[in-house]
């Protein structure tokens, strides 16, 4: 029996994660979507996947809870078996958090939450799931254009994503002998519900940022999802250890 490729997309109950799941499904990939507590949002993602003819399953995952990864890996393995395989082909590390504020307002708890989720969680989830990744599989870590340009009050978030990009390059070297490639996708200003939906809902913010992009607008979630799905395709099988920015030419 021929089994479709299978992807795990973390934080796929909304925003970029949902768009990535749907874009992958459009290309014939089965998708496991995770959420931290928004089961309804995850089910909506499943509905959208099914609407494009895809197949999806839902698992709960708190990316900041590293000790839970062992049981999560077992649950994922059981889902893969239900689909007739033991392999995972694509891991999209999308789940993350952001705390934004000037230097004097950031607390140690804020710092630890962002680093513990975005860096520690991402690293140890890859470590946990590598045994399931097939020869020729891949990891795509979601970063941000803020690792290239600066914006006030984003220091902790952008630093966490810079660490993710460094991890991506190093892990690409470590996992390359197994045929596993690792890349990072760096979205620019995008109209999602991240950070309370500020980019999506604040017309003034969108207009200001649109004026700083080569293409004259902010991005849409579907455009990031398409970029992730394209990077996951066989057509880009020779690409690894790269940071690919998807920003419409923001802040050149």
Over which residues does each language-model region extend?
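Substrate-binding pocket helix/loop in short-chain dehydrogenase/reductase
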Residues: 102-103, 107-112, 205, 209
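Active-site loop-to-helix junction immediately N-terminal to the catalytic Tyr of the SDR YXXXK motif
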Residues: 106, 150-158, 170
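Alpha-helical segment proximal to the catalytic Tyr-Lys
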Residues: 131, 173-177, 237
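Active-site helix of classical SDR
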Residues: 126, 160, 168
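Short C-terminal tail/terminal secondary-structure segment
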Residues: 149, 229, 236, 240-252
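Conserved glycine-rich cofactor-binding loop
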Residues: 13-14
């Amino acid at each position: 029996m021929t089994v479709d490729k299978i992807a795990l997309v973390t934080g796929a109950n909304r925003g970029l994660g949902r768009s990535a799941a749907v874009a992958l499904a459009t290309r014939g990939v089965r998708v496991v979507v995770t959420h931290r507590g928004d089961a309804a949002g995850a089910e909506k993602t499943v509905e959208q996947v099914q609407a494009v003819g895809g197949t999806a399953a839902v698992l709960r995952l708190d990316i900041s809870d590293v000790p839970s990864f062992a049981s999560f890996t077992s649950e994922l393995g059981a889902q893969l078996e239900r689909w007739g395989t033991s392999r995972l082909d694509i891991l999209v590390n999308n789940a993350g958090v952001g705390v934004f504020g000037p230097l004097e307002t950031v607390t140690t708890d804020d710092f630890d939450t962002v680093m513990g989720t975005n860096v520690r969680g991402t690293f140890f989830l890859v470590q946990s799931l590598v045994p399931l990744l097939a020869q020729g599989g891949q990891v795509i870590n979601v970063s941000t254009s803020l690792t290239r340009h600066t914006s006030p009050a984003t220091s902790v978030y952008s630093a966490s994503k810079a660490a993710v990009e460094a991890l991506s390059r190093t892990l690409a070297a470590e996992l390359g002998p197994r045929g596993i490639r690792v890349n990072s996708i760096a979205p620019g200003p995008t109209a999602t519900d991240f950070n309370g939906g500020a980019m999506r809902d604040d017309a003034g913010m969108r207009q200001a940022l649109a004026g700083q992009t080569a293409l004259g607008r902010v991005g849409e979630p579907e455009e990031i999802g398409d970029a992730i799905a394209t990077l996951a395709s066989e057509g880009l099988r020779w690409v690894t250890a790269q940071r690919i920015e998807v920003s419409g030419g923001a802040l050149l």
